[in-house]
């Protein structure tokens, strides 16, 4: 399970990339304050499509306790998200980690409503982080 704020930029991008890099896994995503039922942001979709990943078939969804319980691993973009999930779902604290853990605990900032350059940087960070995680499975 991959988490960000709105589930329209970072987490769906990471979901699509990690699923492509580790097809043996069941990868999903959700948002802490999701833009429920919205598609992936057009700038995030453009980055995915440009780099050969699918941006299709995404509908943002809200994180809830059931999703957390069902997940074997929960990857977040920023430390504050990790703290929040550990506070809100204390039983899951052992399985909540940064997506950027293997990149010196890199935090991946939210590109929402920012430039295409910001989306390109975030895409690069997410792709590198997903590659690092895929090598662990």
Describe each region flagged by the PLM.
Residues 73, 79-137:
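Phosphate-binding/catalytic loops
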Residues 2, 76-77:
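Short beta-strand scaffold positions
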Residues 1-70, 135:
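Conserved active-site segments centered on acidic
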